[in-house]
Amino acid sequence: MTLFNSISSISNSTGISKESLIGNLNSNGIATGNISVSWLGGFDGCGGCGGGCGKNDFLYSSL
């Protein structure tokens, strides 16, 4: 099972939004604005608390 599928499954079973689950995995643990996904590797790491460069939008569409 891929990470994205796992996140979707957890979201569906718990009612916690995928955005919140992803945010909890970022370095700040904050799911506001565009988040850092540098923990996945190969991403630009933009985002964090309430901001971001918008380059990670495809992450949501992948879930």
From Swiss-Prot:
It comes from the Eukaryota. Belongs to the UPF0512 family. This is UPF0512 protein X. It comes from Dictyostelium discoideum (Social amoeba).
